[in-house]
């Protein structure tokens, strides 16, 4: 679909959506997104130009169906997949991708760290993906030197970053906000640094006693990104890994640097979103969202969770979906899903499904709370189907039709019960909705009550 769109842009110094928008040009991607979001294309262009909305769309990802992330559009959900040294293979990761797309992932991140050829798994995922693909290049940078921090050079980081761009990665998590002077602020935390990318860079800085190379070479990375229209996802290396560490000096010091880097990326006309926590008590979520908007000049916010309790291993998708719904309500643009395996192991296909559905609920709830146009239409349609006992319509409109039908059919499997005016909870005699009170009866009752009141 995008080949004809991209061809005229080839060879230009800057092919980013924000560059076109700032020059008053509505790209095919902007027009496509406008139709998906039911918004004017002119508004999409204005929001992209302002930096409040991004369209992650690498020019080498030709089978991509463009989408947007930003406060003007629907709240989006990202799903993480990826192989590890201990589990998974390329075919399994491609199947996870397909499952994630099936259940509504708006973007997918390949977080592979080993166990497979990282280039091959990434190519396979991009080739199969209609949604934007994100990566964390420092993982492969470390893998390329067989885990030896002392052998990892600044140029190694940039080489891997450009390789990901060439392969069609739409956005990359760049942990450029972690500075060497931030590291002492981690003292006193319970869980220290929980970001894998942040941990790698912290070790690099401590070993070489030098500033973060992703910070010192940030302008070079911008020059790479604008050739491919790769989007920055500025990583939060010091995100809190537990409630105790939330909103501390370390996190907020890095956030200030992320704001500086956001504006530097915009100076190069490169798209950017900013990543956020993590583990945050419910009463601090609004503060975290507002603080990011203030420090980062309203660049789209992309949060992991946040989890609102630390005692839910095995159920962290529930704990975090609570925080995610609140974050979305307060203005977060994209929610990174958490699966039931979070903190416990590598998620399988079923974990991907469970995590995604939990987060689609959270994002949808946020859109309803923010009064986005049409956000509640599907809910109202399902409610009408429920009141009319249209079981098949209820299944069809649900976020997970297969699960809804499975649960209904566990107790009433025969096809005749798809027309029944009850389920197994109340049975035929006690369901309040199958004894429908007509509007006419209610009007008559209202008239009688008014007569009684007027005669008193």
From Swiss-Prot:
Pfam families reported for this sequence: ThiC_Rad_SAM (PF01964)
Positions with a binding annotation for substrate: 80, 109, 139, 175, 195-197, 236-239, 275, 302
The keyword Nucleus belongs to this UniProt entry's keyword annotation: no
Class of the enzyme per the UniProt entry, highest EC level: lyase
Disulphide bridges: none
Coiled coil: none
Gene3D superfamilies per UniProt: 6.10.250.620, Radical SAM ThiC family, central domain
Manner of cofactor binding, per the entry note: Binds 1 [4Fe-4S] cluster per subunit. The cluster is coordinated with 3 cysteines and an exchangeable S-adenosyl-L-methionine.
Domain of life: Bacteria
Binding positions (Zn(2+)): 279, 343
Gene Ontology CC entries for this record: cytosol
Requisite cofactors: [4Fe-4S] cluster
Binding annotation for [4Fe-4S] cluster: 423, 426, 431
MF terms (GO), sorted A to Z: 4 iron, 4 sulfur cluster binding; carbon-carbon lyase activity; zinc ion binding
Annotated pathway: Cofactor biosynthesis; thiamine diphosphate biosynthesis
E.C. number: 4.1.99.17
Family stated for the protein in its record: Belongs to the ThiC family.
Listed name of the protein: Phosphomethylpyrimidine synthase
Organism: Prochlorococcus marinus (strain MIT 9312)
């Amino acid at each position: 679909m995008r080949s004809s769109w991209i061809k005229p842009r080839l060879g230009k110094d800057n092919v980013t959506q924000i560059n076109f928008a700032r020059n008053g040009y509505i790209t095919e991607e902007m027009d496509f997104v406008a139709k998906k979001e039911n918004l004017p294309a002119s508004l999409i262009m204005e929001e992209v130009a302002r930096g409040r909305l991004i369209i992650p769309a690498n020019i080498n990802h030709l089978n991509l169906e463009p989408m947007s992330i930003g406060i003007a559009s629907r709240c989006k959900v990202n799903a993480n997949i990826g192989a590890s040294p201990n589990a998974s293979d390329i075919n399994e990761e491609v199947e996870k991708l397909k499952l994630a797309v099936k259940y509504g992932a708006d973007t997918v991140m390949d977080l592979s760290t080993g166990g497979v050829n990282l280039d091959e798994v990434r190519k396979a995922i991009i080739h199969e993906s209609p949604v934007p693909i994100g990566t964390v290049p420092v993982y492969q940078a470390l893998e390329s030197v067989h885990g030896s921090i002392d052998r990892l050079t600044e140029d190694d980081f940039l080489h891997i970053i450009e390789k990901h761009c060439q392969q069609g990665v739409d956005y990359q998590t760049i942990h450029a906000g972690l500075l060497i002077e931030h590291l002492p602020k981690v003292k006193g935390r319970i869980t220290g640094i929980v970001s894998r990318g942040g941990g790698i860079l912290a070790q690099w800085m401590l070993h070489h006693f030098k500033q973060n190379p992703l910070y010192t070479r940030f302008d070079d990375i911008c020059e790479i990104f604008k050739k491919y229209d790769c989007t920055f996802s500025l990583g939060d290396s010091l995100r809190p890994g537990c409630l105790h560490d939330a909103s501390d000096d370390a996190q907020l010091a890095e956030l200030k640097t992320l704001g500086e880097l956001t504006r530097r990326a915009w100076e190069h006309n490169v798209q950017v979103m900013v990543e956020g926590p993590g583990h945050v008590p419910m009463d601090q979520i609004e503060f975290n969202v507002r603080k990011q908007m203030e420090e980062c000049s309203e660049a789209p916010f992309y949060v992991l969770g946040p989890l609102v309790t630390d005692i839910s291993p095995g159920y962290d998708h529930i704990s975090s979906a609570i925080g995610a719904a609140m974050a979305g309500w307060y203005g977060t643009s994209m929610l990174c899903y958490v699966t039931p395996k979070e903190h416990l192991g590598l998620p399988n296909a079923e974990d991907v499904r469970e995590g995604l559905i939990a987060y689609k609920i959270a994002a949808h709830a946020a859109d309803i709370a923010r009064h986005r146009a049409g956000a509640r239409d599907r809910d109202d349609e399902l409610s009408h189907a429920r009141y009319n006992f249209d079981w098949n319509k209820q299944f069809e409109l649900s976020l997970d039709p297969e699960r809804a039908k499975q649960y209904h059919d566990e107790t009433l499997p025969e096809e005749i019960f798809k027309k029944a005016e009850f389920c197994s909870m109340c049975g035929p005699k006690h369901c309040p909705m199958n004894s429908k009170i007509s509007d006419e009866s209610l009007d008559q009752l209202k008239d009688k009550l008014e007569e009684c009141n007027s005669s008193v």
